[in-house]
Amino acid sequence: NHPDGYDVYWAEYNKWELWMNSESGKTINPKTMRGPFCESADVPDTAYDDGKLAERAIRDLRRMKEMNKPFFLACGFWKPHLPFNAPKKYWDLYKREEIPLAPNRFRPEGLPEQVRNSSEIYAYARVTDTSDADFQREVKHGYYACLSYVDAQIGKVLDALDELGLAENTIVVLLGDHGWNLGEHDFVG
């Protein structure tokens, strides 16, 4: 342990390929070894990594409370990054047919084709035409489900802070790394 380092670090070893694939274990794109870009499996929150991370964070909060000294806890929730895999109950919060399409689904003039096809989503199975309205609704549905899923996981950690009596003396910072195009300018990614 380096004095300026972490006392504890948690990540599941060598799980990148498993994370990229679906709960069902289907790998469909042989070039990238990635499964579908979205999945609505009827599984508990802990079937996916963000649910496991929330549970781990709560265990760590309990442990750190007992230490009775200042602590730092970073939780790197992954959602809403691809793949848009979330438990079915979060997909069920939204009706796909009621999800609006982007109002500006046109391509910008002069956009080179290689830019249009550079999106990460093409690495996943079943992705051929991101301009299709049904596809864009499916992508938005998955994005909404993943937002609700990660919101629930963050809520569990915040609830634990309250239950443990730590909330009043804890600073919580939420950061995001980027947004998404969900059909705007005929682009998904």
Roles of regions detected by a PLM:
Residues N1:
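His/Cys-centered metal/cofactor-coordination and adjacent catalytic loops
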Residues Y9-E55, R59-P70, A74-G189:
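Active-site-proximal cap/lid insertion segments
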